[in-house]
Structure formats: structure tokens, C-alpha cells
Amino acid sequence: GEHFCGRVPPIAVLPNGKTNLIALDLGIHGDPIKALERIVEIAKSGLGDHVVQRELIALTDGQTTRPVLGMFLGGAGLADYILYCRDKIYPLGLSNGFSHFLTALAVLASLVFGIRARFLPQSSHPVSISLMREGQLAGRFSVLIVTTLERLLLGVDPGDSRRGNMKLMAVDQSVSALLRLVWASVFRRMGKQQMQGIHLEQGDTIRIEGAQSSVILDGEIFRASEGKPILLRSTEPVPFLRLAA
């Protein structure tokens, strides 16, 4: 914001990656050139209702001199699955959809059937998650998500934003918890009631700590360790451009 005199102009995000979660949350998808053309049209005709406010996640790990900003963080087992897909599946040159399908099959083979092999994802490391004023979670999680996007991965919406701007979902590393997650996501039941093994929380400050535990913030990898936690804080609202008014 220091590069602009006065009010910061809205930020437009173009789809240019494998998942594009931020762009999708803002209604921007498909060909980035066509999306840019649409953005130019909106800018010429007036931004109006296309400007929305979004908080960012500010990550510090004790090593970076300035906070790293993002909107979607994956940790615990999810970070391992993302890295597995990036390192093992994407190099095969397959389409994004088929690559994600193969990754899902590998995760199921590892978690559900207990198959252990070098070419399959490994078990997640124990991690401790602390939320200011909300207590602490500790254990092995197959999924850990922290985001300021309106909707989480799989369409999950934890609800009440008054408890904090960062939304957290942690799923225990167990077959039963994973099946409950799939069932609740398919039938849009997530957040409607408490479910064993699925933790939905919100807060403005989140601390993640664990031996050799990786997190990925918008594609960038960070590692938490004992005595060197990762600290997440929500920022003040930032204006973004949403294509669908």
C-alpha cells in the first residue's frame, strides 16, 4: 500500500497455476487472456459492485524478515499430498484433473488400505495448532487448511466470521474422519453440526508447531519445527476485483 498515494486500487488475480483457488473464489477462471480482457472491460465501464474486501494471511516463521502474504494454506497431511502431486505426478505430463485423480487414489491407498510404498504418500507428522482464545489441537491430521477465502476446499463453509477472519479445518488422520469429510462435503453438511474427527475453527492468530511439519501458503513451502513455530495473523481488509458482481 505504501506505493500508492491514498486509497489502494483493487487487486485483480489471474488464473495461472494448477489449482487457482484464489482466482476461483473471485469468479475468475479459464483462459487468463480472456479473463484479463474481461477485467479491462470492467475497469472501463466502472468497477461498481465488482470490488470485494478480503483479508490476507500474514505468515512469519522466525526466518523471513517480512511476513509472507497469502489466502490459502495447506498443512499436515494435505501439504504432503500437495508436494507428492507436485513432485511425483505432475512430472508425468498428465492433465491437471487426471493428476489430481491419481493423487486421490494414492492417498486412499495409503490411508484407507494402509498400503506403504515409496511411490505412495507417507504418513503425516504430529502437529500442534493453537488458536488465541480458542484452545489447542494436537495430533496427526490428514487435512489441515487455513484460509481467508469465502469457501474452503471441497466447498466447506465454517460460517460465523465474528470469531475471526481466518478459517481453519483440521481432519484427524483416520479412515472414519476422512469418510465423514467426504460425506459431509458431498451432501453440504459441513458446518451444520459437530462431527467426530473434523475440527472447524476461526481466529485472527493461529500458531502451528511440529517436528518436520510442512505448510504451503499459496504454493510456497515453509517448515515448522519444535521451538520454531509458524505464526499466522489475519491482515486488514484488502480490495479485490471479482468478475461476478
Kindly label every feature range from the protein language model:
Residues 148-149:
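Glycine-/small-residue-rich beta->alpha transition segments that form the dinucleotide
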Residues 131-138, 154-245:
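ATP/nucleoside-binding phosphotransfer catalytic cores, i.e., glycine-rich phosphate-binding loops
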Residues 1, 144, 219:
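Conserved Motif II region of HX4D acyltransferases
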Residues 21, 152-153:
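Flexible loop/turn segments at secondary-structure boundaries
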Residues 4-138, 142:
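Catalytic core of DAGKc-family lipid kinases
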